[in-house]
Amino acid sequence: MQSIQTVSENTIYVGASDRRLAKFENLFPIPRGVSYNAYVILDEKTALLDTADASVGAQFLENVAAALDGRKLDYLIVDHMEPDHAAMIEAVLVRWPDLRLVVNAKTLPMLKMYFPTDGAAFDDALVVKAVSYTHLTLPTN
């Protein structure tokens, strides 16, 4: 059963909770479990921000499909490669094979190591390079 939550007009939480774990990273107590946070962004194009741990994989995929409501998935934004964020990448690529990956320069070689494919999904990846920010000073009344 899908379990999604609207965060804002165009953003839907599609993650899932895992109550099996007693400790995060086998170190920090988590008496109420852990949530694997992932979001679908709906606009002219659609994007999925992160995936989830394989332990909640079926629920996660069901949530993403429900949030998309029949629309195709255009982008998968891979934040980083820890399994609790990246374990479902291959399943997402299988289910929505026409999507485009958005990754950083360090993530792309890791994807190729962890998810050996014919390379087509990775060859078309949009690699985000350095980002510069302008510091703004806001007036205080």
Predicted feature descriptions by range:
Residues 134-140:
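Conserved small/polar residues in nucleotide/adenosyl-binding loops
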Residues 44, 55-102:
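Active-site metal-binding motif and surrounding structural segment of the metallo-beta-lactamase
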Residues 11, 125-126:
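Short, conserved active-site loop motifs that form the nucleotide-linked donor/cofactor pocket
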Residues 86-112, 116-122, 128:
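A generic, well-ordered mixed alpha/beta core segment in the N-terminal half of proteins
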Residues 4-66:
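Conserved beta-strand hairpin/beta-sheet module of binuclear metal-dependent hydrolase folds
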